[in-house]
């Protein structure tokens, strides 16, 4: 369960190409990538996610404790720039700030680069596969379209931005495909979650 160490390590390294933001308050480490955010308790990082911790030490030169930094890969190494915690806090709130959520489940379908998930009301939401995976089967979605995965045992959380086509920006063909998918129920809501 929880984060796969190798997947999280790969995701962190990949994000440094454009800039990875880390926020550590001593208890949890929050990593902000492009359209995803991962929250890992520090004790889990030290005990279980050794590869991820090794990657962070390689990038920073030390184990993060109470830091807010942006890491960008440059020639021959990494450039680490301090960030204001308030600025990063606003971005974190954009993902985690909404308390009202509703259940959502994977459909097993993909469209373009998104894997598709469905709410109980039939709405289909596309979620990018970029970033680390979290091996849990309990998902929820906020009104703002943030898909949240949580592992209650370890306290690890992954947030991804959901995608829904918009009438003002997406083509009629895309909207038609989406509507066609939404008329069918792709999830067995009566089956217990694994």
Where are these regions (language model features)?
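Intrinsically disordered, low-complexity linker/loop segments enriched in Gly/Pro
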Residues: 1-40
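C-terminal functional regions that serve as terminal interaction/effector modules
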Residues: 26-28, 32-37, 41-194
